[in-house]
Amino acid sequence: MRERLLAAERVKAIEWRDGTLRLLDQRLLPQEEVWLDHGSAAEVAKAIRDMVVRGAPAIGISAAYGIVLGARARLARGGDWRTALEEDFRLLADSRPTAVNLFWALNRMRERLERMKEGDRPLAVLEAEAISIHDSDREANLTMAQLGMELIRKQQSSPQNILTHCNTGALATGGFGTALGVIRAAHLEGLVNRIHADETRPWLQGSRLTAWELANEGIPVSLNVDSAAAHLMKTENITWVIVGADRITANGDVANKIGTYQLAVNAMHHGVRFMVVAPSSTIDMNLESGEDIPIEERDGRELLEIGGRRVAAEVDAYNPVFDVTPADLIDAIVTERGVVERPDAERMAALMSRKRLH
């Protein structure tokens, strides 16, 4: 499966080339494919905040490279560069509040910094750590793709209709994807009849990104408005809802793109299985439950305007980016460490005590 997935890879969103972070501007897809070069921590933080790059794993990877860029600038200026670098850590940490992968990656970069020995070359050490974070995410995605595909096949070996939300593919990760990685593997195994992709308002990650990724690989995909999901579950023989995650708490609650919670409620009502696919870096064992997760809200103009023109009356807008799905609505959480079925605090703790499978 690994070799087949590698051979099928066609999309990527992050490149580290000659000391520059190159990001595919996802705001312009699918009409334009524009790569932007980033040479400083401040530029990377702005790219994360402005959603040039999005998806929890991709944000974390980008932030790690941002620290490398920050260190390069601080070292060039001389003086107490380590203390000065803390400003870059703070700047990147403040770029998006909900995706825990961001903080995980920054903490890993800080820990590597603290472990440096006399004679180490700081920039080379930090660059190697950022590349390791990037590479390990790709490996995690390959492992999760296999595990998730096996869950699908275990339930039903014939081609199935699957519903997904937002974008969880190569564009959102270091490669292949989380939920879309599972879907890719299932397609290669002949387990996919059709993918139904929610358009995912207001940024339309489903219609702009997910549909684009799947169509590029020849995977049958139909786009639907978000509010059609329950109707699809009732009428189109959906067997799985498969989504990613931006943060998973110690009890198995999941924060993900707004609209995920209602998908889980509808899935339970219709007897549709619900799978969450995310690397273990998304799991925050310091938070007891989803009640503790900070939920980002974005500018209401994202709802009130189209193309910069106001289309709604002079009203306020409520624009949360994420919601929290309780663990008791989730059939399985798939990570590179293994699978947790019917997640709860005890099972999540057992998962996190395991070694990685890749």
Curated annotation (Swiss-Prot):
The active site is at D246. InterPro entries: IF-2B-related (IPR000649), IF-M1Pi (IPR005251), IF_2B-like_C (IPR042529), Initiation_fac_2B_a/b/d (IPR011559), M1Pi_N (IPR027363), NagB/RpiA_transferase-like (IPR037171). Disulfide bonds: none annotated. Its EC number is 5.3.1.23. Substrate binds at R54, G55, A56, R96, Q205, N256, K257. Pfam families: IF-2B (PF01008). It catalyses: 5-(methylsulfanyl)-alpha-D-ribose 1-phosphate = 5-(methylsulfanyl)-D-ribulose 1-phosphate. The record marks C166 as: Transition state stabilizer. GO terms for biological process: L-methionine salvage from methylthioadenosine. GO terms for molecular function: S-methyl-5-thioribose-1-phosphate isomerase activity. Pathway: Amino-acid biosynthesis; L-methionine biosynthesis via salvage pathway; L-methionine from S-methyl-5-thio-alpha-D-ribose 1-phosphate: step 1/6. Keywords: Amino-acid biosynthesis, Isomerase, Methionine biosynthesis. Belongs to the eIF-2B alpha/beta/delta subunits family. MtnA subfamily. Catalyzes the interconversion of methylthioribose-1-phosphate (MTR-1-P) into methylthioribulose-1-phosphate (MTRu-1-P). This is Methylthioribose-1-phosphate isomerase. The gene is mtnA.
